[in-house]
């Protein structure tokens, strides 16, 4: 059973910023042909947008595991979970970050949750996961730990 599920969709401003491929491709292809330039611009922009959407990872907590992107952490190895937002989230991503930590960070999602890893054979001390709803993720992780 799924206790929590979130897809880390790109922020709207990212699609606006990606629109800069339109004038860039027009600049390159209009000297060849205006129609070719317009078609290439639209195709490149659409391709970039589809790429952003397809690359959006999923964070999911089930009765069996925590899934963050392509990584999976079995329920038995889920330790304490702590939510951070604002300046605390910035510190967790920067000055407090352990180089051995496993990261699923997205620049357009500020809050993060740190999940301790209890597996003695795993050199990763914790996972740091971007989430738009840190309290719900921490609550789901608490119920997953049992």
Predicted regions span which residues?
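N-terminal membrane-targeting/pre-transmembrane regions
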Residues: 1-31
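Conserved beta-hairpin
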Residues: 42-82
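Lipid-exposed faces of alpha-helical membrane segments in multi-pass integral membrane proteins
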Residues: 17-21, 40-47
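A structural detector for beta-sheet-dominated domains
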Residues: 62, 118, 130-132
